[in-house]
Design a protein with these regions (language model features):
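Hydrophobic cores of alpha-helical transmembrane segments in multi-pass integral membrane proteins
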Residues: 1, 12-33, 45-70, 87-113, ...
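Surface-exposed, interaction-prone regions used to assemble/regulate multi-protein complexes
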Residues: 259-260
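Long, amphipathic alpha-helical stalk/connector segments used for oligomerization, subunit docking
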Residues: 185-187, 191
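Flexible, glycine/threonine-enriched loop-and-boundary segments that flank and lead into catalytic domains
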Residues: 217-226
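Surface-exposed loop and adjacent secondary-structure segments within mature catalytic domains
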Residues: 6-9, 73-78
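Juxtamembrane membrane-water interface segments that cap and precede transmembrane helices
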Residues: 76-88, 222, 309-310
Length: 322
C-alpha cells in the first residue's frame, strides 16, 4: 500500500499524521521566535524557518489525493502534471529538508566551534534569499527527455545553473569562517567533520547544476551516477555537518567541558570519511559505466551491449558498496 510517489510513498492517513506533527513543530519553532528577547533573528533561524514553511507547502500540495479506502488513494493530478508536481516536491524536499535545514546548522555550529563570527553576515543573507528564490523552480531537471514540455525542462535547467552561485557563496562563507583556525585541523576532529561537510556541499552543488545540463543528463539519467550524487549530499554534507554539530552540542547539553574521548571522535572521522568516499566513488564509476554502455551503438545502429551486460559490469562496484 503506497502512493507510488518517490519520497512520498506513505498513504493518506499517515500523510495526515505527518501534517499534524509538522504543524506542532512549526508552532514550537515560531512560538519560540515570537518570545525572543532580542529584536534580531540570526540567519541560521531564517534557514530553519524557510525549511519548515517550504516542507509544509510541498507535503500538502504533493499529497493531495482522493482516498478510495483506508489504505489506498489516488493522486488528484494526472499525467505530466502529476510528474511535474512530484518532482517539484522531490527536488525541493532534498533542497529544503537536506539543504536549508543543515545550512542553518552550519551557520550556527561552525562559528561556535571556531569561536569567531561568520565570515560575512551580508553574504549569508544573500545566500539565503538567492537560495529560496531560485531552488523552488529547478525540479523539472529530474524530467529531462520525458513528456514534460521542453520549455519547462529548459527553464528548470537554467534555474539549476543559476543555483551554483548562491550554493558556492554559502560554501565559501563557511570555509572562510574557518580561516585562521586551519592549525586546529591537526588537533580538532570536530572541525575536520565540518570542513569535509563543506567540501561535500561544494562538490554536490557543483555536480547538481552540471547534471541538469541536458547533454550531461542524457548520460547520467537513470544511472548510479545520480544515486552517487544524492549520497554525496546526504552522507557527505548532511551526515558530516550533523555529526560535527552533535559533537559541539552534546557537551553543552550535559554541561561537560568536552566529549568523553577525542581519540574516538578522530577514529569516527576517518572511518566515516573513508567509507563515504569509497561508497560514492564506486557509484560514480558504476553510473558512468552504465551510461556509456547504454549509449554505445554499432555501425548499423544496434546496441553494442545488452542490459544484462551492463548489469554484470557494475558487479565490482556494487561489491565495493557492500
Amino acid at each position: 500500500y503506497t502512493s507510488t510517489k518517490e519520497y512520498a510513498e506513505l498513504e493518506w492517513p499517515i500523510d495526515l499524521l505527518i501534517t499534524v506533527v509538522w504543524v506542532a513543530y512549526a508552532v514550537v519553532f515560531f512560538g519560540t521566535i515570537a518570545k525572543r528577547t532580542t529584536s534580531h533573528i540570526y540567519v541560521a533561524n531564517w534557514f530553519f524557518a524557510a525549511f519548515i514553511i517550504t516542507i509544509a507547502l510541498l507535503h500538502i500540495i504533493n499529497s493531495m489525493a482522493v482516498p478510495v479506502s483506508l489504505f489506498k488513494s489516488y493522486s488528484m493530478y494526472s499525467g505530466a502534471t502529476d510528474a511535474m508536481i512530484q518532482w517539484w516536491y522531490g527536488h525541493n524536499a532534498v533542497g529544503f529538508f537536506l539543504t536549508a535545514a543543515f545550512l542553518g546548522m552550519m551557520y550556527y555550529f561552525i562559528p561556535v566551534q571556531v569561536g569567531r563570527p561568520v565570515y560575512s553576515y551580508r553574504l549569508s543573507v544573500v545566500h539565503f534569499w538567492a537560495l529560496i528564490s531560485v531552488y523552488m523552480w529547478a525540479g523539472g531537471h529530474h524530467l529531462h527527455y520525458t513528456a514534460l514540455p521542453d520549455w519547462t525542462q529548459s527553464l528548470a535547467m537554467a534555474f539549476s545553473l543559476v543555483l551554483f552561485a548562491p550554493s558556492w557563496g554559502g560554501m565559501i562563507n563557511g570555509v572562510m569562517t574557518l580561516s585562521g583556525s586551519w592549525d586546529r585541523l591537526r588537533t580538532d576532529p570536530i572541525i575536520r567533520f565540518m570542513v569535509v561537510a563543506l567540501s561535500f556541499y561544494g562538490m554536490s552543488t557543483f555536480e547538481g547544476p552540471m547534471m541538469s545540463i541536458k547533454t550531461v543528463n542524457a548520460l547520467s539519467h537513470y544511472t548510479d551516477w545520480t544515486v552517487g550524487h544524492v549520497h554525496s549530499g546526504a552522507l557527505g554534507w548532511v551526515g558530516m555537518i550533523t555529526i560535527g554539530s552533535m559533537y559541539v552540542l552534546i557537551p553543552r547539553v550535559f554541561e561537560r567541558e568536552r566529549m568523553y574521548s577525542i581519540s574516538l571522535i578522530n577514529l569516527h572521522f576517518w572511518l566515516a570519511t573513508i567509507g563515504v568516499v569509497i561508497y560514492i566513488a564506486s557509484l560514480w564509476i558504476s553510473g558512468i559505466t552504465q551510461g556509456l554502455m547504454w549509449r554505445a551503438v554499432n555501425v548499423d545502429g544496434t546496441l553494442t551491449y545488452t542490459f544484462v551486460e551492463s548489469v554484470k559490469a557494475t558487479y565490482p562496484f556494487y561489491m565495493i558498496r557492500v
